[in-house]
From Swiss-Prot:
Organism whose genome encodes this protein: Influenza A virus (strain A/Turkey/Ontario/6118/1968 H8N4)
Membrane topology reported for the UniProt record: Single-pass type II membrane protein
The keyword Glycoprotein belongs to this UniProt entry's keyword annotation: yes
Protein name (database record): Neuraminidase
Topological domains, Intravirion: 1-6
One biological process term in Gene Ontology: carbohydrate metabolic process
Glycan-linked positions: 50-51, 57, 62, 69, 145, 269, 399, 417
Superkingdom per UniProt: Viruses
Residues where substrate binds: 117, 151, 276-277, 292, 369
Gene: NA
Regulation of catalytic or functional activity: Inhibited by the neuraminidase inhibitors zanamivir (Relenza) and oseltamivir (Tamiflu). These drugs interfere with the release of progeny virus from infected cells and are effective against all influenza strains. Resistance to neuraminidase inhibitors is quite rare.
InterPro entries (UniProt xref): Glyco_hydro_34 (IPR001860), Sialidase_sf (IPR036278)
Length: 470
């Protein structure tokens, strides 16, 4: 074999060996891939080895031992859902301590603050929020003109953190509404906003911002709701709806709601009673509401119901009357409205029952929505006399008040084995009592404490008129 033939033979052998080696490598890679694929995608019946891998869940700090042979599959765990539960009474209260004050009108003279009415507060386990009905306008702006009107297509329910002036930068849209309620069941927020024409208004229910149900006006006469928080217990939320005249017999429904879906409706048989704008709170396993009688009563009607929607109704017995306008304190009634020529109209308000006693929130003025005070009547839930056992001043009679309502802070937040009673007071400014082109309000909130408190005056404090009014 000559040298050239040797070179050709050696080269051919090298190429063959290289090709064989490459094929073996490819075969090995395919075998490894196929084996890995089967292990990941097919179920394993054999016992796992003792290899241990820790994983960290972003929702909660939750380190879990996962034993496997080859692969760790990371799956998010469900959050620890806590629903508000029933069974707690109201915490004992000696007086009322300031919780928040937003000063919205004062700040709005030079800041971007919404024109609002009907503010109310509601708390989840982690935060308290102020809900309010806007007019689609800002203070000291031309669109604030004429905002004394209650119902318009521009009104929306929005919310912001409690204690801050409501502005576009800190507020969250909730619902298109000129009447509303909202509450948390623990994991989520329920909102109910009523909008539309007076004769065919519709309530739109949302759970965590998603539309879940609707309810149409059944009497065709300004269907309306609480203008304060609904109440949630044991995964269900409860609210009251009114439809019918504001100055005659109207019609009422209790709604039972789960995750935004209406699961039960109860018509309230309340001939001679008038329930509007009820302020509700949890009371043991029940829900208790104190409402506005816009027809005949200067005393406030109440309704108490359980989870089956079985209910009782009556009037706050005390001769210390809670509505406005009202007569001077006198003889109350437990079962019928007290008129004395002052029973018509009214204002949203609240009371808290403690056994036979009752804390009554009310304006200081008999005729106008000015001033505010908390009055303790130790027998006022069962006795019709006018004897009070203590008064705490909130706003002096030279400053405007307005609507007021109840809310509560639950034991799941505080760790106490009771429900903390709280209330808010709206301070209406502008029309119809002041020379402005607009109507709006700020709010202040208090919670019950079983320790020392003080009375004072915490008014709105804004200097009117604004530039837009001149």
């Amino acid at each position: 074999m000559n040298p050239n033939q040797k070179i050709i033979t050696i080269g051919s052998a090298s190429i063959v060996l290289t090709t064989i080696g490459l094929l073996l490598q490819i075969t090995s890679l395919c075998s490894i891939w196929f084996s890995h694929y089967n292990q990941v995608t097919q179920p394993h019946e054999q016992a796992c080895s003792n290899n241990t891998t820790n994983y960290y869940n972003e929702t909660f700090v939750n380190v879990t031992n996962v034993q496997n042979n080859y692969t760790t599959i990371i799956e998010p765990s469900a959050p620890n859902v806590v629903h508000y539960s029933s069974g707690r009474d109201l915490c004992p209260v000696k007086g009322w301590a300031p919780l928040s004050k937003d000063n919205g009108i004062r700040i709005g003279s030079r800041g971007e603050v919404f024109v609002i009415r009907e503010p109310f507060i509601s708390c989840s386990i982690s935060e308290c929020r102020t809900f309010f009905l806007t007019q689609g306008a800002l203070l000291n702006d031309k669109h604030s003109n004429g905002t004394v009107k209650d119902r318009s297509p521009f009104r929306t329910l929005m919310s912001c953190p409690m204690g801050v002036a409501p502005s576009p930068s800190n507020s969250r849209f909730e619902s298109v509404a000129w009447s509303a309620t909202a509450c948390s069941d623990g994991p989520g927020w329920l909102t109910l906003g009523i909008t539309g024409p007076d004769a065919t208004a519709v309530a739109v229910l949302k759970y965590n911002g998603i539309i879940t149900d609707t309810l149409k006006s059944w009497k065709g006469n300004i269907m309306r709701t609480q203008e304060s928080e609904c109440v949630c217990q044991d995964e269900f939320c409860y609210t009251l709806i009114t439809d019918g005249p504001s100055n005659a017999q109207a019609f009422y429904k209790i709604l039972k709601i789960r995750k935004g879906k209406i699961v039960s409706v109860k018509d309230v048989n309340a001939t001679g009673f008038h329930f509007e704008e009820c302020s509700c709170y949890p009371s043991g396993t029940d829900v208790e509401c104190v409402c506005r009688d816009n027809w005949r009563g200067s005393n406030r009607p109440w309704i108490r119901f359980n989870s089956d929607l079985d209910y009782q109704i009556g009037y706050v017995c005390s001769g210390i009357f809670g509505d406005n306008p009202r007569p001077v304190d006198g003889i109350g009634s437990c079962n019928s409205p007290v008129n004395n020529g002052k029973g018509r109209y009214g204002v949203k308000g609240f009371s808290f029952r403690y056994g036979d006693g009752v804390w009554i929130g009310r304006t200081k003025s008999l005729e106008s929505r000015s001033g505010f005070e908390m009055v303790w009547d130790a027998n006022g839930w069962v006795s019709t006399d006018k004897d009070s056992n203590g008064v705490q001043d909130i706003i002096d009679n030279n400053n405007w008040s307005g609507y007021s309502g109840s809310f509560s802070i639950r034991w799941e937040t505080t760790g106490r084995n009771c429900t903390v009673p709280c209330f808010w007071v709206e301070m209406i400014r502008g029309q119809p009592k002041e020379k402005t082109i607009w109507t709006s309000g700020s709010s202040i909130a208090f919670c019950g404490v079983n320790s020392d408190t003080t009375g004072w005056s915490w008014p709105d404090g804004a200097l009117l008129p604004f530039d837009i009014d001149k």
